[in-house]
């Protein structure tokens, strides 16, 4: 009787868990097309913004596009 219980447990519980593809197993679809069209400068800005870092410019090139100005 115990052997039959083990066999039922394996086939009814463990086997379906091993064969199911969970969401974590699926490849993530991120907007790959859109990200390939982004220039390296824009990509850097996105990453810096996500990391919470500021983009600083050298003093002669401060035109308002950067967050801070530093002297060289």
Curated annotation (Swiss-Prot):
Origin: domain of life: Eukaryota
Tissues expressed in: Expressed by the venom duct.
Entry annotated with the keyword Transport: no
GO molecular function terms attached to this record: ion channel inhibitor activity; toxin activity
Cystine residue pairs: 56-68, 57-66, 62-69
Coiled-coil parts of chain: none
Family: Belongs to the conotoxin M superfamily.
Entry protein name: Conotoxin TsMLKM-012
Organism from which the protein derives: Conus tessulatus (Tessellate cone)
């Amino acid at each position: 009787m115990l052997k039959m219980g083990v066999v039922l447990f394996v086939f009814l519980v463990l086997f379906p868990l091993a064969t199911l593809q969970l969401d974590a197993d699926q490849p993530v679809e991120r907007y790959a097309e859109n990200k390939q069209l982004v220039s390296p400068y824009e990509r850097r800005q996105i990453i810096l913004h996500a990391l919470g870092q500021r983009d600083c410019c050298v003093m002669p090139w401060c035109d308002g596009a950067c967050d801070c100005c530093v002297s060289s």
